[in-house]
Amino acid sequence: MKLCVTVLSLLVLMAAFCSPALSAPMGSDPPTACCFSYTLRKIPRNFVNDYFETSSLCSQPAVVFQTKKGRQVCANPSEPWVQEYVDDLELN
């Protein structure tokens, strides 16, 4: 009886610590960041220190700028100022 309780306890603990991502098929995770609207104003270039592009799985393309204060701002990738910031960040 003690053996059954011990084995059952171990199985429950193992199930609790298993990550669901390990059992999911590759590529089934949803995108981590999508933008549903863009900023209406051009943000000052000196506020921005990094950027990334949203996943192609998102409903609309976007560039997400990371500010020095840690905020994320969604921007329209077809805007000239957004392309200029991306080019500048790539060079630096």
UniProtKB/Swiss-Prot annotation:
PANTHER family: C-C MOTIF CHEMOKINE 4-RELATED, SMALL INDUCIBLE CYTOKINE A. This is C-C motif chemokine 4. Disulfide bonds join 34-58, 35-74. Belongs to the intercrine beta (chemokine CC) family. The lineage of its organism: Eukaryota, Metazoa, Chordata, Craniata, Vertebrata. InterPro entries: Chemokine_b/g/d, Chemokine_CC_CS, Chemokine_IL8-like_dom, Interleukin_8-like_sf. Residues 1-23 form the signal peptide. It comes from Bos taurus. SMART domains: SCY.
